[in-house]
Regions:
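Aromatic/basic-lined ligand-recognition segments
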Residues: 101-102, 149-170
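Well-ordered, non-membrane alpha-helical segments in soluble/globular domains
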Residues: 91-97, 123-134
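Glycine-rich, often proline-containing surface loops adjacent to acidic residues and nearby aromatics
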Residues: 21, 104-120
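Structural alpha-beta junctions
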Residues: 44-55, 132-146
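N-terminal alpha-helical "arm" segments
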Residues: 2-43
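N-terminal low-complexity, intrinsically disordered segments
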Residues: 32-102
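Short acidic, S/G/P-rich loop/turn micro-motifs used as interaction or catalytic elements
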Residues: 32-34, 118-122
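A structural signal for short, well-ordered beta-strand segments and their strand-loop junctions
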Residues: 113, 144-149
Length: 170
């Protein structure tokens, strides 16, 4: 290996997903307005443990803009935004080859992201944990789910997103 090869290696950009957490983004047609009680109930159902303060490894941290869910060894951040994900939906959807995906993306007005903050968790396991929580909060407002790290979008109008989450849960 020559000097130029070493130099290229030092200054080469990391792959996009090297530092990106595993994430599931629910694209919503209308705001969720999630309450602490709703998030605790969803986490309790997802992980089979009461979120009532009785177990220090299972709790919900609450702030109006950022919520966290501690599920045993896992830490999940839950971020809500009352704006389209990645900017103007029509502009983002222009590159879609599938018309149904394009229409679903354009429909969304707001989003909720579930990010696993534990970087050392294997990808399949990370998505399993996230899918358990996201599946409990999925409802008719959801236009689809997006996995940024995988650049994968699944629509919900035909139940595909729900089925995708179910498969990820294992």
């Amino acid at each position: 290996m020559g000097f130029l090869d070493v130099a290229r290696g030092l200054f080469r950009k990391k792959h996009a997903d090297d530092d990106m957490p595993c994430s599931i983004v629910m694209l919503l047609r209308s705001p969720f307005a999630m309450s602490e009680e709703i998030l605790k109930a969803a986490a309790s159902k997802a992980f089979g443990v009461p979120y009532d303060g009785s177990n220090a490894m299972y709790f919900v941290g609450w702030h109006p803009r950022l919520k966290t869910v501690k599920a045993g060894p896992y830490l999940i951040s839950v971020l809500e935004a009352e704006e389209p994900y990645l900017g103007d939906p029509a502009e983002v959807a222009q590159g879609f080859k599938n018309k149904r995906l394009e229409e679903a993306w354009i429909e969304h007005r707001t989003w909720v992201a579930f990010d696993l903050m534990n970087g050392e968790v294997p990808k399949k396991q990370a998505y399993t944990v996230l899918a358990k929580l996201a599946a409990e909060l999925l409802d008719t407002r959801c236009a689809g789910i997006y996995l940024p790290r995988e650049n994968q979008f699944t629509i919900q109008s035909d139940g595909s997103a729900e089925m995708h989450l179910r498969k990820m849960k294992g």
